[in-house]
Amino acid sequence: MIDTDIPKILAIKYARFVDDRQFDSMREIMVDNFTQSGPGFAAGSLDEFIANLQVLNNYSATFHLVGNQYGEWQNDLYRGETWSVASHIYEKDGEQRKLDMGIRYQDVIETEGTVFKYLSRDLVIVWTQDLPTTV
């Protein structure tokens, strides 16, 4: 029987690796032929995905909050969805701002024995909000 916490664990690691800028650590949770698509971008391999993550260096910080999850295992393959709110802190015209995104990740995870990795993780952006920050 497959541990039902696996999708949550992978999603939390993904958020941590992004927020801590540990982009190469994605290799721990993604297959080499990992793919991702979203509005205005795509990656056809894990190397391309990691290269795409460099755009996040334009932000002074990010904060990805992992929320609801729903999905099912069928043999060694999981297909499901992860809800997330991603905050991106940046400066514009001398003002600190926060771009928030409501995201629904479309997750596909495979298992080989005791190793679980993403095959794909597509993004559906439900909403965005860009406001000045208050500290």
State what each model feature region is.
Residues 13-14, 84-85, 102:
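A structural preference for long, well-packed, hydrophobic secondary-structure segments
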